[in-house]
Amino acid sequence: RDCGKMCEEETWKG
């Protein structure tokens, strides 16, 4: 899935 700018941070967990 596309995370966008969240991909840059480790906050993205999907």
UniProtKB/Swiss-Prot annotation:
Intrachain S-S bonds: C3-C7
Chain positions with Glycine amide modification: G14
UniProt tissue specificity: Expressed by the venom duct.
Keywords recorded for this protein, A-Z: Amidation, Disulfide bond, Secreted, Toxin
Post-translational modification: Amidation at Gly-14 does not impact activity, since a non-amidated synthetic peptide shows the same absence of activity than the natural amidated peptide.
Entry's Gene Ontology cellular component terms: extracellular region
GO molecular function, one term: toxin activity
Subcellular location(s) of the protein: Secreted
Domain notes from UniProt: The cysteine framework is C-C.
Note: Negative results: does not modulate oxytocin (OXTR), vasopressin (AVPR1A and AVPR1B), NMDA (GRIN1 and GRIN2A), muscarinic (CHRM1 and CHRM3), and nicotinic acetylcholine receptors (alpha-7, and alpha-3-beta-4), and voltage-gated calcium (Cav) and sodium channels (Nav).
Role summary: Probable toxin.
Name this protein carries in UniProt: Conotoxin Cca1669
